[in-house]
Amino acid sequence: MFAIPFTASQVYSHLGLYLQPIEKLDPLTKVQYESAEKLRDIIAQLSRRSGGISLRKNLIRDIACGHKPKLNIPSLTHQVRHNREFKHGRSQFILVDSNGSDYYDGIFDDMVLILQSNFVLPNVPGIISEQLRLIVIDNDFYLKHIPSEIAILRDVLSEHMVKFSIDGVSLEDPFISKFFRKPFVLYDHTKFKKIDLTKVVLINKTGKSKAQVIDKYKLNDDAVFINYEVFDVMLQPTKRRDGDIEQFIRMRGDIETWKAKIGTTFEDNLLELFVHGVPVMNSTSQLQLDFQISDIRVASVFDDQIVCASKLNSLREQCLTESSLIRVNIIGQKGSGKSMLMKLINERGIPGISRRIICIDSDAYGKWRTQTQYIDNKFEALKLINVDNLYEIARDDSVVSFYEQFIIDQLLSHNIEISEHTNSLRFIKQLKVDILKDIGRKFKEMYLADFKEQGQFYEYLCGNMPEPSNTLLITFLHATVETSAAPGTNMNFSLNTILYPLQSILNRKRGTLVNFILNRIYDEMGTEAFTRLRPCDVWK
């Protein structure tokens, strides 16, 4: 039973929670809900009686635990205890040395009320609890709205506390996930615009107006600000104000280091922002700078930092104790920062891991397919599956991935040629949904047919890895489904950075249309099924 009734929808909506339609609850959950509401009604009626709810706390505790109401014999007055008529008429309520309620005026009427309500606690061993628990959300706003007759029962009822963090109510909680809708974060690429990153300027969190900041740091009038604040604890991101395009990033690190960067551009500090910025599931605090609604993503508010830290520690332990090739897969959207993360790993390594680290680019397989499509000798093609070759072709922009070429060919079938015009934001915004759907369907059909060969590619790569006992192989992928073909491992991560993929793609100097379509397709194929890996959790 939730401490606040679901009819108080404004309380739950304030916390970002919206009730599932009761008729859509699964049968067991529906039974639990109906029992809880019946108990709530009993409590409401008892609270209106003489003496209020405090006299009746133990009585309510009993029925919430599935017991019939009972009365302690020793607590009865001498007169009542020896009243023959009373004992015969109310014997069903009395049990010698019971743990029931003490006698008070009106207790027998209360017991009659409970029995007449036909309240039955559902009890399916191993499936439904043997007692009805009080569900409380650990949030000041929620706690202060708990009705007084429920609040007074918290010390006698079995209580389940729902965690609340900076990201909101824990959606992983079993009671929250049963009764409330799963929230989504909404984005819209129709309102995007390309951003000149040389005009995006870092400023410290300040109350100064835009004009004052421009004057203080001698900036151009068209400068775009990104506020930042160094923190030791999680802070709530600020919102836009006064119609200006204003963003807020939460940073980790030494405040003096970041003070030195005030007035410098986002572009000049991109790598450090990427490493130390803490991604949040809030549209105004990621680095996309102009959008509304159309891209829908499931929001996760689980504590990413704790789960990720545990998994990274497990990886470090494997690298120390195992004498075989250790494999990790990192899944990230087109434009999410996979290449930047790979560059960081190659340059800085991973703290706590002394093994040689080899990173395989997410486009490596697609470019190898392009490189070998005209080679008849399969052995010659297999010889090109080696770390050095894959590294070189991944860096070579002149090699078009097999998958990118497929999109180009499909666009041509719709009479769309790649040009400066079709790569423009104006054209992308007007691209028909039917064309996107048709290309997406054919891409998935091709991808499925190609799946076996992709698996053989990674199998050969792992089987011919030099010095496997001292190597950590990190494979970057575009979508969750690719993990079935990629090197087998239980170390799968979903990349989560401060960059918003669509904005990153629209700011690219080449392949904007093709990458936009691939972004949409891979997003449909899934990218967020695994533990979220944030750069700020790797390099603290």
From Swiss-Prot:
Q: Where in the cell is it found?
A: Virion; Host cytoplasm, Host cytoskeleton
Report whether GTP-binding shows up as a keyword of the record.
no
- Give the principal location in a single coarse category: virion
Q: Name one GO cellular component term.
A: viral inner capsid
Sorted keywords for this record are: Capsid protein, Host cytoplasm, Host cytoskeleton, Inner capsid protein, Virion
Physiological role: Minor inner capsid component. Displays NTPase and RNA 5'-triphosphatase (RTPase) activities. May function as a cofactor of polymerase VP2. Associates with microtubules and plays a role in the formation, structural organization and morphology of viral inclusions, where the assembly of cores and the replication of viral RNA occur.
Q: How does it assemble?
A: Interacts with VP2.
What's the protein called, per UniProt? Microtubule-associated protein VP6
- The organism named in the record is Aedes pseudoscutellaris reovirus (isolate France)
